[in-house]
A protein has these predicted regions:
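Extended recognition/assembly regions associated with phosphoester-bond processing machinery
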Residues: 1-78, 82-226
Length: 226
């Protein structure tokens, strides 16, 4: 079975995984989104890459879709919101921020080099990590005793193999006992295939669906370095 959203319980809290790659925390009415990489498409186009102009708008259309679906009180971007320095997409982002009512927090990532003052001017709080109850929200995956960690950065994907050795790699939510790595939300962000570990749970994104993936027993843990 596959679904537009897929529910999961973590530390007694309810979450909904969305096919866009966003994760909704029900009790907090908070949307978690990682690795949008706004500005990346404009950056590529500037240097001659054949990326269609409409791809820029796609990121904002997807953001609008998921915000309208969940109507969150808060949105936490978990790093790499912007891919590089300021470009024309910043103005589009400002317009988008002013069009919604959700409170926005940015947990900064390695690509977030734009001055925090620019974010503060549009009422976005920039922090290095966010702790809420027994949950730790970071950009890079972290292990911290007593906490369940939500992170991004890896752009996780799973390789699915079918008949005739045909295979496909799909972005996914990747969950271990103490972590969940969110898929990259943005267009043209790339993916990094992880080898599932014993006890892991994987939820692949396929079109407008979230698909739970059965995991076979394996002997090695994934390399989550990138």
């Amino acid at each position: 079975f596959c679904f537009m959203t897929y529910p999961i319980q973590l530390h007694g809290q309810s979450f909904q995984m969305h096919f866009s790659g966003a994760l909704f925390w029900v009790e907090k009415s908070m949307l978690l989104i990682s690795d949008v990489h706004l500005g990346k498409i404009s950056h590529f186009r500037k240097y001659g890459a054949a990326v269609p102009q409409q791809a820029i708008q796609q990121n904002f259309d997807t953001l609008n879709t998921v915000v309208e679906f969940f109507k969150p009180k808060g949105i936490t971007f978990m790093g790499d919101l912007f891919h590089s320095s300021l470009n024309s997409e910043w103005a589009l982002f400002e317009e988008w921020v002013h069009s919604i009512t959700s409170e926005i927090i940015l947990v900064s990532g390695n690509h977030d080099i734009i001055s925090p003052l620019k974010y503060e001017n549009i009422h976005i709080k920039v922090i290095s990590e966010l702790v809420i109850d027994s949950f730790l929200l970071t950009h890079h995956p972290e292990e911290r005793d007593g906490f369940f960690n939500f992170s991004g950065h890896i752009h996780p994907a799973i390789k699915l193999t079918g008949l005739g050795r045909q295979s496909v790699r799909l972005p996914c939510f990747y969950k271990t006992q103490s972590q969940m790595i969110l898929p990259a939300f943005g267009e043209f962000t790339g993916i990094y295939t992880l080898e599932p570990c014993n006890g892991c749970e994987v939820f692949a994104l396929l079109g407008d669906s979230v698909l739970p993936v059965p995991i076979k027993e394996v002997k090695r843990k994934p390399n989550t370095r990138k």
